[in-house]
């Protein structure tokens, strides 16, 4: 998104969120102006400045994940993605090392889940739905556990991108 690329719905959401945050800070900007900052690379440049100011390494931003396992998860049937329950997938990611159950748990910064589909997207059997990244060994049972939380229906699912803006 910060490189001016990515899904249009996510870009639009990010621009709307940025507009609200700017307004809260007393700065008025149109959605078009905000989008221009993304496409021109200004937002990415500012993010890089913030990473450097906090002692971060810019190379880490652009280095691909170096994990033992990159497991693709495919749609098991044709239809429409009806649900990708955040709680279940969040707990799953935590067990991969991408989160903590307790404060003292270690984090594996390379672990996580990248979703290729979102709720409402059409899929055909065999389409990539997500990729699991982890340094743990993953068995078929674990993949099946993940897949049971990818709900696919044979009818179009109506989705609201933003449920409500609370001011």
Each model region followed by its residue ranges:
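Well-ordered secondary-structure scaffolds
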Residues: 1-167
């Amino acid at each position: 998104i910060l490189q001016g690329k990515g899904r249009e719905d996510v870009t639009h959401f990010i621009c709307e969120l940025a507009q609200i945050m700017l307004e809260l800070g007393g700065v008025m900007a149109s959605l078009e102006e905000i989008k221009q900052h993304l496409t021109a690379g200004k937002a990415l440049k500012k993010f890089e400045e913030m990473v450097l100011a906090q002692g971060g390494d810019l190379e880490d931003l652009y280095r691909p994940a170096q994990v033992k396992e990159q497991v693709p998860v495919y749609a098991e049937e044709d239809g429409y993605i009806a649900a990708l329950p955040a709680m279940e997938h969040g707990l799953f990611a935590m067990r991969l090392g991408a989160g903590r159950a307790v404060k003292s748990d270690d984090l594996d910064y390379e672990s996580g889940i990248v979703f290729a589909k979102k709720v409402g997207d059409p899929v055909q059997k065999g389409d990539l739905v997500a990729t699991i990244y982890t340094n743990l060994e993953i068995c078929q049972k674990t993949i099946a556990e993940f897949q049971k939380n990818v709900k696919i229906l044979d009818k179009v699912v109506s989705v609201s991108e933003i449920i409500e803006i609370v001011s």
